[in-house]
Amino acid sequence: MARYIFITGGVVSSLGKGLASAALGALLQARGYTVRLRKLDPYLNIDPGTMSPYQHGEVFVTDDGAETDLDLGHYERFTGRPAVRDDNITTGRIYRDIIAKERRGDYLGATVQVVPHVTNAIKEFILTGNEGLDFVLVEIGGTVGDIEGLPFFEAIRQLGNELPRGHAIYIHLTLLPYIPSAGELKTKPTQHSVKELRSIGIQPHILLCRTDRPIPFEERRKLGLFCNVRENAVIEARDVSSIYDVPHAYHAAGLDQEVLSAFGIEPAPKPDMSRWKAVMERIDNPEGEVTIAIVGKYTGLKDAYKSLIEALSHGGIANRVRVNLDWIESEIFEGTDPAPHLEHVHGILVPGGFGQRGAEGKMLAARFARQRKVPFFGICFGMQMAVIEAVRSLADIPLANSTEFGPTNEPVVGLMTEWMRDNELQMRAAEGDLGGTMRLGAYPALLAAGSKIAEIYGATEISERHRHRYEVNTAYREQLAEKGMIFSGLSPDGLLPEVVEFQDHPWFIGVQYHPELKSRPFAPHPLFSSFIAAAMEQSRLV
């Protein structure tokens, strides 16, 4: 039977519970255990698919088409285990399912309440689908004391009593702030956070304390005494230079050993940290550096591009170079020459996005890369803008546009209304709901033999994750091919363009899918490895 590790947070939000969960999962894997990581999000949205990137950050898409929390990206990158729809649930999804059951009469006239109906639904979600696993790590979003999180805390409290003895532990991630004027770390916020947690019936087994400096013995002793945990269970989670050093840092601090001790697993098998050491060796000893411009719409919140940032770093790991990112808001290009902002960079990446704001700036970035022969990588919306720019400039159709921005007589990009998934026709209406109605998840694509994209993949059949409701119009295919831009990747039915590239350019590729979602530090995505390699070549010319 699986053992359960519940990870909660306190004092402040954005402490890194997702990263801590992922790192612990990686450490348990390194000891030979099988793990699954799951996330409970207390917000009332069904999923984060319609939430602003400025509020939620990135929407991480799974192979099975779920729009989930960005922490699932950490889980995948650290453990290599693909996440699925049922690794993430929200209060909104739970309430929707409960209300649907109530309307059907499934509760036989009972008064539907938070306890037991909501808490039972949460417990059922946590316990389902874990057969054959050694450990299930469950992260609870938000911080202890949040009103919306109370049903989740109550559910995991009940599970602590209902699971067999020795099959559930609680880890509380907290912050030890340093007060310069006092010259010391303060433990009182953590004490109050644990007091709040204990008031709802949860006694943490381990305190994982975020800090920028070593925890003195006296503070460690004080935390153990007033938080009712053993001193050895007060784990120092020191800041590190790279997130990929977190597994090693947590192992050195004794987190994985303390977790196994809390479960009574002795002696514990030694972890194999070789692949993490290999990754850090490349990060710590770069043989060069490149600068990549990210021309985006949500650059004010870097979490909106979390997987993209990590995938670029993976490309750097593969090529033994440091990747410096130059964040550029695409709107600043509109009506101006982008050259002063882009002449110094070695590669230009235009990521996904929605809506007309900043679209013209993205097209100008694509034009600059095309004309100056700078490596260009367009992803999803970025590919669409590159195609529109090519139709306007090369095919001499200045009114070319996307129907996403309004009616147009030259719809180079249009709304998808029909596509195939698993041999079934999927249909969407233009006036339908926005949530969950895009082309989501893994879809196959066929690559043209002899194309640059096929050379990069080393294959002509691939599967990648998608998140879009607009597509490039194949009616412009021949006109673009005459100008050097080819559709080098298509859906199996030949109707949906998946990849475009310029044949006479050192590296100009646009993809409709999101390759960043499948990149790993120890298995960099080939597109990002190739893009960074092209940027290295460009760095020798600039």
From Swiss-Prot:
Catalyzed reactions: UTP + L-glutamine + ATP + H2O = CTP + L-glutamate + ADP + phosphate + 2 H(+); L-glutamine + H2O = L-glutamate + NH4(+); UTP + NH4(+) + ATP = CTP + ADP + phosphate + 2 H(+)
Binding site for Mg(2+): 71, 139
Keyword Magnesium in annotation: yes
EC number, UniProt record: 6.3.4.2
Metabolic or biological pathway: Pyrimidine metabolism; CTP biosynthesis via de novo pathway; CTP from UDP: step 2/2
GO cellular component: cytosol
InterPro entries: Class_I_gatase-like, CTP_synthase, CTP_synthase_N, GATASE, GATase1_CTP_Synthase, P-loop_NTPase
Family matches, as Pfam families: CTP_synth_N, GATase
List of catalytic residues: 380, 514, 516
Keyword Lipid biosynthesis carried by entry: no
Residues where UTP binds: 13, 186-191, 222
Region (Amidoligase domain): 1-265
Binding site for L-glutamine: 54, 353, 381-384, 404, 469
Glutamine amidotransferase type-1 domain sequence ranges: 291-541
Entry superkingdom: Bacteria
Regulation affecting activity: Allosterically activated by GTP, when glutamine is the substrate; GTP has no effect on the reaction when ammonia is the substrate. The allosteric effector GTP functions by stabilizing the protein conformation that binds the tetrahedral intermediate(s) formed during glutamine hydrolysis. Inhibited by the product CTP, via allosteric rather than competitive inhibition.
BP terms from Gene Ontology: 'de novo' CTP biosynthetic process; pyrimidine nucleobase biosynthetic process
GO molecular function annotations of the record: ATP binding; CTP synthase activity; glutaminase activity; identical protein binding; metal ion binding
Amino acids binding CTP: 13, 146-148, 186-191, 222
Function: Catalyzes the ATP-dependent amination of UTP to CTP with either L-glutamine or ammonia as the source of nitrogen. Regulates intracellular CTP levels through interactions with the four ribonucleotide triphosphates.
Complexes and interactors: Homotetramer.
Protein name: CTP synthase
Originating organism: Beijerinckia indica subsp. indica (strain ATCC 9039 / DSM 1715 / NCIMB 8712)
Lineage, uppermost ranks: Bacteria, Pseudomonadati, Pseudomonadota, Alphaproteobacteria, Hyphomicrobiales
Name of the gene encoding the protein in the UniProt record: pyrG
